[in-house]
Amino acid sequence: MKELKIEPTGAAGWRVWFSSEENPVLVARHHWVGVDFDGTLARNDNIGHCQPPYPLGEPIPEMMARVKSLLATGITVKIFTARACEPQNVPIIQDWTERNGLGRLEVTNLKDFNLIRFYDDRAIVATFKNQSKDDNL
């Protein structure tokens, strides 16, 4: 995973090249980037991972570097995880992010219209273009 190219655009936010194969994305100051926790930011192959108390894995260096580069420019990063369904897990994950040099990041399981990018190890990526009523589905 290559380091992100990020250019400030003044008050508007940043121009971010999330991939060398894509055009840059304007990330406004109100936008945020979501990062899944298990299997994306933290390893999920640790002993007992799938059994209570569901221990947290070690950091994944490549994604940690990507998150640090986003945070260093001022872009908001939130941990997006199903673990947040149980509120007692939120401070545990925040402690982990703080211990691992990311600061105390917001942890959520809710999307909103300001989520501009999402990193996940299990999501299926699909891109849809606007279709006219004449297009076949």
Please report, for each region that a protein language model flagged, where it lies by residue:
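HAD-like aspartate-dependent phosphatase fold
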Residues: 2-137
